């Protein structure tokens, strides 16, 4: 169900979030 999807999303963000933010900041400063 959607709750499982939400839980996976949160786990994914917890794992990937810092890298995504770092990449976005690098793209913005180029």
UniProtKB/Swiss-Prot annotation:
GO terms for molecular function: toxin activity. InterPro entries: Poneritoxin (IPR010002). The keyword Ribonucleoprotein does not apply. One of its GO terms (cellular component) is extracellular region. It is found in: Secreted. The keyword Flavoprotein does not apply. Coiled coil: none annotated. Expressed by the venom gland. It comes from the Eukaryota. GO terms for biological process: defense response to bacterium; defense response to fungus; killing of cells of another organism. Keywords: Antibiotic, Antimicrobial, Fungicide, Secreted, Toxin. It holds the Pfam family Ponericin. Its main location: secreted. Shows a broad spectrum of activity against both Gram-positive and Gram-negative bacteria. Also has antimicrobial activity against S.cerevisiae. Has insecticidal and non-hemolytic activity. Belongs to the ponericin-G family. This is U1-poneritoxin-Ng3b. The lineage of its organism: Eukaryota, Metazoa, Ecdysozoa, Arthropoda, Hexapoda.
């Amino acid at each position: 169900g959607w709750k499982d999807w939400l839980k996976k999303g949160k786990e994914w963000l917890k794992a990937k979030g810092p890298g995504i933010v770092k990449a976005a900041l690098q793209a913005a400063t180029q």
